[in-house]
Amino acid sequence: MERKDIATPSRTKALLDQFGFNFKKSLGQNFLVDVNIIHKIIDASEIDDNTGIIEVGPGMGSLTEQLAKRAKKVMSFEIDQRLIPVLKETLAPYDNVTIINEDILKADIGKAVKTYLNDCDKIMVVANLPYYITTPILLNLMQQDIPIDGYVVMMQKEVGERLNAQVGTKAYGSLSIVTQYYTETSKVLTVPKSVFMPPPNVDSIVVKLMQRETPLVSVDDEETFFKLAKAAFAQRRKTINNNYQNFFKDGKKHKESILKWLEQTGIDPKRRGETLSIQDFARLYEEKKNFPELEN
C-alpha cells in the first residue's frame, strides 16, 4: 500500500494521536500540512540527486520526506527528543536521511557535514525554520566555515523582509547587511497561516539566499565590521553620530574624532543608519583604522 504524504492535515493529526504528541510553544512548533507549498520550496532550491541537504526542525518529517525523494542525502537537526520516534517511523523508507537529535546552535555542523554529506557535490540548507530562533540559526550557518551553496528557508514574514530589505527602507538593518554581505537574497513566496498545524500567529515567507563567490565588500575583520554596522542601528531614530558616541568607549570624550572620522569618509553625521549602504559601512570600517582612539 502506498504511503500517504506526511504533509496533510489528516496524516499529521493521525500521527499526533498515535504518538500522543503535544506541541511546545517554547520550541515554535508549527507543522506544515500542504504538500504543494513543500514542492514549491524544493523547486526553488534547485536540488538534484547530487545535492546534500541540511534541514533544521523537521517536525514530523513533512518536508524531509519530499527532500529525501529528490536529494542525494538529507541531514536533519531536531532538538525535541519526543519527535525522534515519530521521525524514525515516518522516514523509515528513506535510507538517505540522517536525524541528529541536537540543538543546531550547539552542534558541530562542520563535523556533521564532513561525516554525512562529504560525497555531495552541492550543499543546500532547506528548512521550515523555528521562528523563535530564525536569525541566530542563519547567522550561525553563514559565519561558519561550511561549504554551503545556498538556503531556501521559511520564516516569519517580518524577518524575511529584513533579510531582503534595501537601503533606506524601514525593514533595512544590521540583519540585512550580514545576509546580503554573504548572499544574494530573493523572495520565493508568501505562505498563509492556514497551511500549518497549529496555525502560527504571524504570516510566513520563503526566502532564497544564494552564497556569493566572494562577499559583497572586502573587509579584513568581519566581526568588527558587523559590530560597527550594528551600532549604527542601536537607536534607529538617532543619527549615526549619536549612535557612535554611545558605541565607542569614551565616545562623548572623543566626539570630535567621531565627527572627523565620519566627515573624512564623506558621510554626513546627521544621517541615520538605515540610509547607509553596505559599501558605506565598509568605507567607515576602513577609515576607522586612522582613528585608534575610537575603541569599543
Swiss-Prot record:
Catalytic activity: adenosine(1518)/adenosine(1519) in 16S rRNA + 4 S-adenosyl-L-methionine = N(6)-dimethyladenosine(1518)/N(6)-dimethyladenosine(1519) in 16S rRNA + 4 S-adenosyl-L-homocysteine + 4 H(+)
Alphabetized InterPro entries for the sequence: KsgA/Erm, rRNA_Ade_diMease-like_C, rRNA_Ade_Mease_Trfase_CS, rRNA_Ade_methylase_Trfase_N, rRNA_adenine_dimethylase, SAM-dependent_MTases_sf
Gene name as annotated: rsmA
Top-level taxonomy: Bacteria, Bacillati, Bacillota, Bacilli, Bacillales
Gene Ontology molecular function terms on file: 16S rRNA (adenine(1518)-N(6)/adenine(1519)-N(6))-dimethyltransferase activity; RNA binding
Protein's cellular compartments: Cytoplasm
Organism from which the protein derives: Staphylococcus haemolyticus (strain JCSC1435)
CDD domains for the chain: AdoMet_MTases (cd02440)
The keyword Cytoplasm is assigned to this record: yes
Cellular component, GO annotation: cytosol
Keywords annotated in UniProt: Cytoplasm, Methyltransferase, RNA-binding, rRNA processing, S-adenosyl-L-methionine, Transferase
Family: Belongs to the class I-like SAM-binding methyltransferase superfamily. rRNA adenine N(6)-methyltransferase family. RsmA subfamily.
Protein name: Ribosomal RNA small subunit methyltransferase A
